[in-house]
Amino acid sequence: DDGGALHAPGSVIQKENNKNDKKILELMSNIIQLLTGEVAIRTHHVSIYFSLDEWDYITGNKDLYEEGMKEEPQQLHPLAACEYKDESNVAAHTEATLCCNNDGNFTEMSPVEQPPPANGIKEEVASWEGGNQSDCSINKCTEQIQGTDTPTPIMGYRMNNSLLENYISNAIKEETASCEEINQSNCSINPLTEQIQGTDTPTPIMGYSLFRIPCNKSDESADTSPHKSRITKKTLHKKNSCVVSHKITPIGEKPVSTSGCGKYFMKSSELSVHPRTHTGEKPFPCSECGKCFINQSTLARHYRTHTGEKPYPCSECGKCFASSTYLRDHRRIHTGEKLSSCSECGKYFLNCWSLARHHRTHTGEKPYSCSECGKSFAISSDLAGHRRRTH
């Protein structure tokens, strides 16, 4: 005899499970009442439908209606006007049925007794906020019962311009996804599979979608264009809009490259400019001096030498510069950072091109030659000064 040994009787656990199941069914029934606005009672072969106001009155005066009302309604069978998106045969004890009138509105949804469901069933509900929507359809939603292999249909129905009120409880978690596209005539929600604990079969739920679609930024396209990235939450872009101004290179994919030198670039705009360094093309001339440049940014930086504009001030000393590159090099004076050193004399320089120019004093290299007289110079600025003075 164990005496005071601790144990968990199966009957106690079963009572707790039944209590939890009853709470979940009550919550589902409340949600259906919010959807339909009606309460259904069935006696023998006759179905009677009451509005919420009528049901409140009957409940308050139930002593007068004992013969026509039951405390726990039995399961109702689908009427002739019922509409299902999936007509597969499912056991009656695992099914919850929604019926509608001939006008297409909701009329009845009966909670039924079923085996204990998995704890923490998550129901995802989608609401629509777009303008002039005429029809929104929701695909059938199924859940997986813990310890089983067969998906169980929960509800399959059509909504006509109705919004589900937010209903928050401890057992059911609702997440709303809004469809913001203007003048949308048909909004369809694709299912996403979710794995319920203790099962091996993915279960479709509504409201989310996984996709990988390249971003084709175009003002003429009428379709939404999600970016080339893996979407884990449902993301809807407004028509003819682009959230990100540049393409994102997906993981595992190489950036674009040229066919000539094999150099890689992260942006297609950089790829289009790079071949000009091989061909020598400079299609952007300066309106002041006529000097040409390979891109607009270089032209804009050069143009500041004519206007005297220096929009990049140093936060330490207040000195201004015409280029952000010059400002970056200047800041190294304050920080003491010296990245480039000469291998011959050990002298430090703020940038690599200053080091390269200095290194020619050791090698004697003069790569800049005058096309008029053939004289060579080690620095391009010396060549430019020679042309102005001599030629």
From Swiss-Prot:
Q: Give the CC-aspect GO terms.
A: nucleus
Offer one Pfam family short name for this entry: zf-C2H2
Could you tell me which PROSITE patterns the record lists for this protein?
ZINC_FINGER_C2H2_1, ZINC_FINGER_C2H2_2
GO biological process, alphabetically ordered: regulation of transcription by RNA polymerase II
Q: Which domain of life is it from?
A: Eukaryota
Which SMART domains does the entry link to? ZnF_C2H2
MF-aspect GO terms: DNA-binding transcription factor activity, RNA polymerase II-specific; RNA polymerase II cis-regulatory region sequence-specific DNA binding; zinc ion binding
Sorted keywords for this record are:
DNA-binding, Metal-binding, Nucleus, Repeat, Transcription, Transcription regulation, Zinc, Zinc-finger
rRNA-binding is among the record's keywords: no
Annotated C2H2-type zinc fingers sit at 284-306, 312-334, 340-362, 368-391
Q: Where in the cell is it found?
A: Nucleus
Family in the record: Belongs to the krueppel C2H2-type zinc-finger protein family.
Q: What does this protein do?
A: May be involved in transcriptional regulation.
Protein name from the UniProt record = Oocyte zinc finger protein XlCOF7.2
Species of origin? Xenopus laevis
